[in-house]
Amino acid sequence: MARPIILSNNELQVGLSRHGEVSDVYFPYVGLENHTIGGNTRHRVGVWVDGRVSWLSDDGWSCKFSYHHEALIGHIVAVNEQIGIMLEFDDAVDTDFNVLLRTIHVVNLRPETRDVRLFMHQAFIIGDSGSSTDTVQVLPNDNAVIHYRGRRVFAASGQIDGGKFFDQYAVGVFGREGREGTYRDADDGELSNSTAEHGRVDSTIRFKLELAGHGSARVNYWLAAGTSLREVLYIHKNIISQTIHKRFEATAKWWRLWLRPAKKVAQRVKPEYRQAFINSTMLLKAHIDKRGAVIASSDGEALNYQRDAYAYCWPRDSVYVLWPLIRMGYIEEAYNFFDFCRRALSPKGYLSHKYRADGALGSSWHSYVHPDGTVSAPIQEDETASVLFLFCQFYNKTGDDTLLQRFYTSMIVPMANFLASYVDNRTHLPKPSYDLWEEHFMVTTYTTATVQAALFAAANLADQRRDEVGAVAWRTVAEDIKQSAQKRLYDPHQKAFRKGLRRNKNGTYTPDDTLDMSAVYGAFIYGLYDNQEDLHQAIQTALDRFHFKLETPGLPRYEDDAYYRSAPDAPSNWWFIVSLWLAQYYLECGDENSAQRIISWVASQAWPTGVLSEQIDPVSGRECSVAPLCWSQAEFISTILDTIKR
């Protein structure tokens, strides 16, 4: 699984696969709807030469990926020595129009003149619909091929530099009735020029080139997205009239302007990390919908195996994504996210497990009925706490009093009241909820740390608002939680933080001593534990138990973590966020050498575009799960920011 190139204008988002093919097309939200879900919906790119066709996903092609220096514009170099062809792509999603732009430099690597035909293929399951009611039609007068279903319309077109449009086309059914798709029509270099079809449909267009020995030509391709035929044809005609090159220039200019705060900071970043820092910042922006949702990952590859994907807004993940942006001075993204959370907030004051980009509840495997026999909302309390804590940090950073006017009564008060009330009076700890890793219903050290930090921060805001009732109530609960946590969640004999406590059916609690790095990190970063000597010892205990080595500084989430593990008896996968947490701890302690070794190792595991996966297999070194994972990118940025001398 990987999308080494992500392109976005915060409404249309496109993911390119390791073969340089369009594999995810999200519209009209980032993360929703994916119109290329499932097998065979990738948009193939093929070259016919010397009597046969070769697709980029075939053997023989090697692809190199990069981003332009200061813009979310992808660059791909695809070479096939066997057929003597090189394709150089520059790719972008236009920042003003909902359209994917691709310029393709087709190079003949042989000395003789050759007939070369470039094929661009489009395949959709529009709106993630299983109803097979899509339509594809050729519009010869507009030099476009359109795909539509209801209020989702796409228009594909292209020109050879000099103005000539595609010269052949084919439309048809794929994945049904024994048909593989219209791309197979290109096997002989010719297309059928069929003009309309409905059902599960695809299309292919051809550009015919005559390339001199070691010569080249450039093909310009675009795919417009809209909610009506009129809209996509308007975009299509603008690309033609303005030229694709002008649209690339406008898009590059927009990104250069947006990157100004990050570039200012990057001047103080070590040169070897500077480009990865900038790229990671752009990747975060690419996953933020203009209406506020922050998507965890748009890598839709898991859907090819009929699993759910990560194209949701987890409030907690969003907090970690937004924090480095706030630190660099970005305002709009956080403001829109808080608006999103305010709209999503339940009447009781909590946020749910995860959300779709349109604000609706996301899919969830969490039950209302819990192992201890209780029935309660299936929430992860740390998500509500994290958002509240981030808002307080955001306000402190900006000093913008209009934030309190807009959000204090409508979001801060209900969140803080919920957190203060969701406490077990016997333990003075938060009641059980699902843990950070979405697996266990229990009281965790990590969640406890976030709750007390959020309540302390909210109490400080209440002081500024002269809300004495809120300030006293929230600070009192926070102090009780912190005091109780130091007694119940730290094991002085093991010199370790517990994962947490599991509530039994009779209301008592049983300690869970599983070593979990989130417990250590939560206690450290959210100030849960005052005894610094014990805190340092707990971290060392964790590192010893995990046989940690700086030479290969990978760490799992917790003991015996089976998620994406290659085999039942294999070691648990390493998570980049956990290694970066440790680097942040080292920096706080003044151990810059150890931190830099971790940062360097993480950077070495990234794609050339800076893309980081969620996990890697510690044995094979293979990336696992989605890539990019915004949380990984964000922790990389946060750690780099921590290295900068204030």
Language-model segments: what does each one mean?
Residues 155-178, 272, 276, 346-356, ...:
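Extended ligand-binding clefts on enzyme/binding-domain cores
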Residues 65-70, 75-77, 293-302, 312-313, ...:
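Helix-terminus loop motifs that line ligand-binding clefts
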Residues 1, 77-79, 83-188, 203-205, ...:
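Polysaccharide-binding surfaces and accessory modules of carbohydrate-active proteins
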Residues 65, 114-115, 208-231:
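Short Pro-Gly-centered flexible turn/kink motifs
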Residues 1-81, 149, 154-183, 250-276:
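An extended acidic
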